[in-house]
Amino acid sequence: MSILFPRAAVLAVALLPYLATAAPLSLEEALAIAVKRSESTRAARAGALSATEAAHSAAQLPDPTLRVGIDNLPATGPDRFRTTRDSMTMKRIGISQEWLSADKRAARQAAADAAVGRETVLVQAAAADTRRQTALAYIDAFYANESLKLAKLMEHHAHEELEASRARLSSATGNSQEALALASARGTSEDETADVLQQQGAAGAAFQRWVGVMPDELQPPGAIALPTEEAYVAAHPTVSAMQRDLEVARRTAAVTASDRKPNWTWEIAYGQRTGYSDMVSVGVSIPLPVAPGERQDRDTAAKLALVEKAEADLAEASRAATAEYRSLRSDAQRLEQRIDRYRTGVVVPAGQRTAAATASYSSGQGSLVSLFEARHAEVEAQRKLLTLQRDLAKTQIQLAFRPLTAEVAQ
């Protein structure tokens, strides 16, 4: 309760300007809200904090060891277990310290810093994924709203023309077939509106999953700047993560290679005897690598194999990101061409047909059914154009929001 309340308060403050003015929400505002409330980004930040804290101790020496004991304590005879009767019995206290060379500590620090870099990339990746998913949900919600406007317009047209047909039928200037056809058309329009409302509800639920609120109106997404192929591949989340994994593997291999030189341990102890002089002992422990080719070198070879694996994974990820960019860019270009052709070849003629049918009906030469069909065809053309524009916007978002940015959510 104490953890969730401050986060809810922060979200409420972020939403306050929108809720107070009830202004249409923009894409950038939605992205900012989504990143602030993203739990995946918060989890990634916690991972980065953990790695950062661990890195602070990477180059430190191990803790010293306190050693306390009794040497040469009698175990048999009349003086057994007595610490003050035998001259050889000595109470001892000392301290030992394992020593790591500066090179080893530097290697461990570099490996820890590489791990921090990897976790930082994961924070950026979580924020970028949240922004991309939010932008896609925004596009779906925006175009669902626009499609609903067209569906309601078509329903309004069908209602108008059905009422006009009934009026003509009551005045004996119309016919029942026309009225029945328009009644069926109105029912179809109402069903289409219900279908679009269902789609709008699904899009709104997806939008709420990221932003937490579904406004009545969204601003048009506007132009979306697209990256170059080189920038897309370099900042692709998978490629960036693989680059960090490669760096971690290299640093880890360096740490393992440094273990071929053993760590020395020095020790100093003070011994107290009864009736005799106290003593001081000083010593150094040096591990002896008796078979480095079968132990230390094997460990290093294992780590170097992981470096090679990371290099191959990075190369494969770069190829996949390049193919992904080219596929999305090709889809975007084809959609742009289709939109231009469809607008010129279908939408404009459909509008001209509606104008001609309206003029013909006004002059008494055309029928209400012909007018409705012309209006319906124009609205359908506009809905198809909206679908193409939505697909283009979603493709552009995949291109623009997939790569990592320098901005990391606070």
Task: Enumerate the predicted regions with their spans.
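A glycine-/polar-enriched beta->alpha junction
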Residues: 32-42, 49-64, 93-110, 121-128, ...
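Residues that define the transmembrane beta-barrel architecture of outer-membrane proteins
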Residues: 87-91, 276-280
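Bacterial Sec-pathway N-terminal export signals of envelope proteins
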Residues: 21-70, 75, 98-99, 107, ...
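Periplasmic alpha-helical coiled-coil/stalk elements that build and connect Gram-negative outer-membrane
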Residues: 2, 25, 126-237, 328-335, ...
